[in-house]
Amino acid sequence: MAKPLTITSSHSHFSLAWRAYFEMTKPKVVALMLLTVLVGMCLAVPTAVPVQPLIAGMFGIALMAGSAAALNHLIDRRIDGMMARTYNRPLPKGRVSAKRALIFAASIGGLGFVVLYVLVNPLTAWLTFASLIGYALVYTAYLKRATSQNIVIGGLAGAMPPLLGWTAVTNQFHGHALLLVIIIFTWTPPHFWALAIHRRAEYAKVDIPMLPVTHGVEFTKTCILLYTVLLAIACLLPVLVGMCGPMYFVCSSLLSSVFIYKAWQLKYRDRDGLAMQVFRFSIYHLMLLFMALLIDHYLWS
């Protein structure tokens, strides 16, 4: 009787450990990021994306993004343990040790780099590595704790995925790819500031100088509203350069209008839970916007 119990116990332990490591890669965040990578790939060519850069590129970028997320968990483990939103993460709860988290992050990051360098191209490998360093070290380890503009400056690393997808297919920079980077770069501040308003007390408790902590909630609401207007303009850039057609224009205009309206509500008609509604809508905004880019590309071309 003991042997089956041991097998069951071992299987259960392995399953729990696997889930803990998987959680450290922030799979939902990476999934949204991979959508923008895919759109970058598809928009880079007029026909179907070649199979090798598609599969190897998505796999390698996903591994390195997961590595960056795991490093974020490792670096933030102390403050994560003090915040209600993050206290149950694997490192604060002791489900994964700091040493094993570092080994895991280095392993999948190294594998991802090799995949991109060998099977895709060196340019994409190095750009993805730069994004990893920008997010995990420049933003998480320094900017996040150093300035209220942490999200604005550090947002560049998180805005890179469409460019990575583009270079994975073409092995070169292109102005159209940079327009996609600008969209995500402009989207990032209102997205995170809405969350920061909702979690202001927690950020203040752990001495993270998010904008609502350093400049107040009302100032942050104003900044969110202004950035949603700026984002609406950025979202029209692909139309202005002839990169997209009427279908994307309509979808972009509708999404931008709703985002601006919600930001206006947050500023002038705030109520309990509205900041989190704005935060959640921003996720759908980016997802639907890039899906519209993808669909329009094949309709327009």
UniProtKB/Swiss-Prot annotation:
NCBIfam families: cyoE_ctaB, PRK04375.1-2
InterPro entries cross-referenced by the UniProt entry: Protohaem_IX_farnesylTrfase, UbiA_prenyltransferase, UbiA_prenylTrfase_CS, UbiA_sf
Domain of life, per lineage: Bacteria
Transmembrane segments: 29-49, 51-71, 101-121, 123-143, 150-170, 177-197, 223-243, 244-264, 281-301
Record's miscellaneous remark: Carbon 2 of the heme B porphyrin ring is defined according to the Fischer nomenclature.
Membrane topology: Multi-pass membrane protein
Name used for this protein in its record: Protoheme IX farnesyltransferase 1
Gene Ontology molecular function terms on file: protoheme IX farnesyltransferase activity
Pfam families: UbiA
Role: Converts heme B (protoheme IX) to heme O by substitution of the vinyl group on carbon 2 of heme B porphyrin ring with a hydroxyethyl farnesyl side group.
Any one GO biological process: heme O biosynthetic process
Enzyme class: transferase
Protein family membership: Belongs to the UbiA prenyltransferase family. Protoheme IX farnesyltransferase subfamily.
Main location as per UniProt: membrane
Location relative to the cell: Cell inner membrane
Enzyme Commission no: 2.5.1.141
Reaction(s) catalysed by this chain's protein: heme b + (2E,6E)-farnesyl diphosphate + H2O = Fe(II)-heme o + diphosphate
This protein's record includes keyword rRNA-binding: no
